[in-house]
Amino acid sequence: DMVIDIDDEDSQNLLRLFNCEEGKKYLKEVVGVPAETIEKLSFLGISGIANMLCCIKFAKYYELTEDDVVATVATDSAIMYTSRIDELNEQQGAYDMLTAARDYSEHLHGVRTDSMLELSYQDRKRIHNLKYYTWVEQQGKTYEEINQQWYDTHYWTDMHAQADELDKLINEFNDATGVLANM
């Protein structure tokens, strides 16, 4: 097990690189990224970009090669962050090729293996216990529920067995709010 920290500056600046026209132009013309790949980068939002960066750090840390595979989840999409891109453009100025070069070099190509920790049993338990505040004090869960997550070997498999019911609730929510109608 491992914990990997990603700086918000990395994922937010890459959000601009992947979604502003000058960033896409830089990736295509200077880096040589295929146009089809560039168009798919908008599938990644801030969290998805952070997940991708975790994979890069993980691969560098373990000195993986082209023969290895690392997978992650695109947990969100850039479509959720158009207003954030506008805010960043307002705060940092219009996005240009020089900014794209900086962002590529510093926030993607320059990813380092700092802020990572291979976890021992006690490290994992210490991180697990950080849930106390958010789960018990904020969400009203019990300490017994937190311990159940740690000690009950069936807790997470039982949770995954609820996927169909959770999907049904998500679909009902989406229908009720009309959230998908505007996408």
Whereabouts are the PLM-identified features?
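Short hydrophobic alpha-helical module
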Residues: 6, 58-61
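A short acidic (Asp/Glu
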Residues: 55, 81-84
